[in-house]
């Protein structure tokens, strides 16, 4: 690096192929800023510690980095050290000498060889976020007190985490947490894997009047929560995996007449033994500003939710099977109606009892998600919904008697096989419906009525096994209604055989996809009239016999994929009728799968690929032995060429590749018969070559053993063979 000796800033972030730095990095004595974030770096050379001018060292997301250099203490001008997202096991000794540090994202407490927690004492200017990890290595409360967190007034986020091994739930660990009391200026606090049976008094002290966010995670042995209702600024509270907690009582709210005055989001998750939520009975709403309440995997929680949540907008309840169960114990009152007048979004899942369905009458409710309900046959009437998602309701038979609300804009139905799709007259009422998704549902549906929804833009039907046709309703306005449709996707409908006669009257359709429709023999007629179509994706249609032979492909197509359409082999002589060469907007073409070998050969031999192509992907053509050069040579705008899983491919046309003057990327994968790259070399424009699982090419090029062959690719800036970067 002799020419870089005056360098002050060096950024190498996001290059995951960088696994080490040269020792000569130490020669950059003027370097102030070094960013190695999200690289594959495994170790830093010791010479990094001679960069005495270094002020910023960023190592965030270096997942392979397990240690820092031993002499880090020498970087006395370092102000910002970010090691978040690394695997560092302990900090080097004497980190306390880095007194200029303003940002230290993590501090991993060492055992006998690394830094003790006392090294934090001298780092009095730390601000921002600090995570102290492996607190199980702290000797006792006296040791913890040495960290002097109380006086670190610039810290606004603090994480205190013990190791992942079995937690120590003795009095010692409570003493450690007690002495780690932070400054009152703290805004966010996270405690993870704490092993004590109770929390120290400072946690929940009303003097912490700036804390806005708190996370208590994996504190398995605590049997009660601190009085968090006293934290007047608290806006978000997340509590997870407190397996010894059985009752959440008035102590949670603390002393104030109106607890949780600022709380807006409350989440409980994976509380395996939690059975009862007892409110304080303070007289007014206990969560006056709560907007979002989330309960997940609390299988024993019985009774009712807090009944008065006047500001609640979003409620998610998952895996709480006995909550609101009217068959719960007689001592629990579940009859009180819920006052959730501002509720806009409701998500209930995994067998939550139907008592919660009373919330469907809430006037402002606009988004509803019901999943894994096993004892519901008919949906109750719903008033003003905009979005409805039904998933995995095996007993659901019908929609509400009055139909769905006319305000509905999005309807998604997944795995509701017994559900009867809406009758024609009810479908016609959904005048605002914009998106409709049907997956593995409505087994009784044989035909889908196109043109019934005047504003539908997206229709996605998958795995509807008995669907036979898409038909155009014979009503005035049906064709006009289809003018809004932009996206049509049909997948996994094995009995689909026909479309409306004369084709799809969808002038604004931009995406059209068909896959895994075994009986389908042809695409819709007059597909060339779809002048707005940009993407056409055809996959796994084994009986498809023809494509666009009555006028060619849509003229403005940009992306075209055809894979695994075996019967098209017999039609390869009419490939010219597709009019591919006339598609001046086509940028991406993907072809692959059984039977498409002949199609590709025809396209190349007749030079039918348009010159506008930017991306060409050839895959899974088992009998393809070579690429006909003349069919490639004219693709002067091609930027990326990908060839994969072509077992019989033996050589590439070198002369033709030389004509690809815009080619930047070449990917070759799983082509075992390919032994050499062209002797003529690669085009000068090529900047990236990736060879993956090609045994012949690996032997020839991986170790640069054959200089005559290596010379043909040595000009390429980046060559990657499997997962190893060669140059």
Kindly label every feature range from the protein language model.
Residues 1-113, 121-139, 150-170, 181-198, ...:
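Predominantly recognizes leucine-rich repeat
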Residues 143-148:
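A substrate-engagement module of RecA-like helicase motors
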């Amino acid at each position: 690096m002799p020419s870089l000796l005056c360098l002050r800033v060096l950024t190498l972030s996001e290059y995951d192929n960088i696994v080490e730095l040269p020792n000569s990095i130490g020669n950059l004595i003027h370097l102030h800023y070094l960013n190695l974030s999200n690289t594959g770096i495994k170790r830093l050379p010791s010479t990094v510690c001679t960069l005495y001018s270094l002020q910023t060292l960023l190592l965030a997301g270096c997942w392979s980095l397990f240690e820092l250099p031993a002499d880090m203490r020498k970087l006395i001008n370092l102000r910002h050290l970010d090691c978040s997202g690394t695997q560092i096991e302990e900090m080097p000794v004497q980190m306390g000498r880095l007194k200029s540090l303003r940002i230290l994202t993590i501090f991993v407490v060492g055992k006998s060889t690394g830094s003790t927690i006392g090294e934090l004492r001298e780092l009095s200017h730390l601000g921002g976020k600090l995570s102290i990890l492996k607190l199980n290595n702290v000797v006792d409360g006296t040791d913890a007190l040495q960290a002097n967190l109380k006086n670190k007034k610039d810290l606004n986020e603090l994480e205190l985490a013990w190791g992942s091994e079995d937690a120590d739930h003795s009095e010692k660990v409570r003493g450690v947490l007690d002495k780690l009391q932070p400054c009152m200026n703290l805004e966010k606090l996270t405690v993870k894997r704490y092993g004590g049976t109770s929390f120290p008094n400072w946690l929940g002290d009303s003097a912490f009047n700036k804390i806005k966010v708190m996370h208590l995670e994996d504190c398995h042995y605590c049997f009660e929560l601190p009085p968090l209702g006293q934290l007047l600024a608290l806006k978000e509270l997340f509590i997870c995996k407190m397996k010894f907690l059985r009752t959440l009582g008035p102590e949670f709210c603390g002393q104030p007449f109106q607890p949780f005055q600022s709380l807006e989001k409350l989440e409980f998750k994976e509380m395996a033994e939690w059975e009862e939520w007892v409110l304080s009975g303070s007289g007014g709403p206990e969560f006056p500003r709560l907007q979002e309440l989330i309960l997940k995997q609390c299988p024993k929680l019985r009774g009712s939710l807090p009944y008065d949540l006047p500001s609640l907008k979003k409620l998610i309840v998952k895996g709480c099977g006995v909550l609101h169960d009217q068959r719960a114990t007689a001592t629990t009152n579940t009859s009180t109606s819920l006052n959730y007048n501002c509720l806009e979004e409701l998500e209930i899942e995994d067998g939550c009892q139907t008592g919660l369905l009373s919330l469907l009458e809430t006037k402002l409710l606009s988004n509803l998600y019901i999943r894994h309900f096993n004892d519901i046959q008919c949906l109750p009437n719903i008033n003003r919904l905009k979005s409805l998602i039904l998933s995995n309701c095996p007993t659901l038979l019908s929609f509400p008697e009055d139909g769905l609300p006319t305000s509905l804009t999005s309807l998604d139905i997944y795995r509701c096989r017994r559900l009867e799709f809406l009758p024609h007259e009810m479908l016609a009422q959904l005048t605002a419906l914009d998106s409709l998704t049907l997956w593995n549902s409505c087994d009784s549906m044989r035909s889908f009525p196109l043109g019934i929804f005047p504003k539908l833009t997206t229709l996605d039907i998958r795995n509807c096994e008995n669907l036979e046709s898409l038909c155009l309703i014979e009503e005035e306005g049906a064709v006009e209604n289809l003018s809004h449709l932009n996206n049509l996707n049909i997948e996994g409908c094995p009995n689909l055989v026909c479309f409306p006669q004369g084709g799809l009257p969808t002038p604004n359709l931009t995406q059209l996809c068909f896959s895994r429709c075994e009986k389908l023999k042809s695409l819709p007629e007059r597909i060339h009239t779809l002048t707005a179509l940009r993407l056409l994706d055809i996959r796994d249609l084994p009986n498809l016999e023809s494509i666009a032979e009555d006028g060619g492909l849509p003229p403005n197509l940009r992306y075209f994929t055809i894979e695994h359409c075996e019967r098209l082999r017999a039609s390869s002589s009419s490939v010219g009728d597709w009019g591919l060469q006339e598609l001046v907007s086509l940028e991406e073409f993907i072809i692959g799968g059984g039977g498409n070998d002949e199609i590709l050969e025809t396209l190349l031999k007749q030079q039918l690929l348009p010159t506008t192509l930017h991306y060409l992907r050839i895959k899974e053509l088992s009998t393809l032995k070579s690429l006909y050069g003349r069919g490639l040579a004219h693709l002067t705008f091609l930027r990326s060429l990908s060839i994969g899983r072509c077992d019989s491919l033996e050589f590439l046309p070198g002369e033709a590749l030389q004509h690809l003057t815009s080619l930047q990327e070449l990917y070759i994968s799983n082509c075992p018969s390919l032994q050499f790259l062209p002797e003529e070399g690669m085009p000068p424009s090529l900047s990236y070559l990736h060879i993956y699982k090609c045994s012949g090419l690996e032997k020839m090029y991986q170790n640069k053993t054959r200089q005559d062959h290596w010379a043909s690719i040595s000009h390429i800036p980046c060559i990657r063979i499997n997962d190893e970067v060669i140059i």
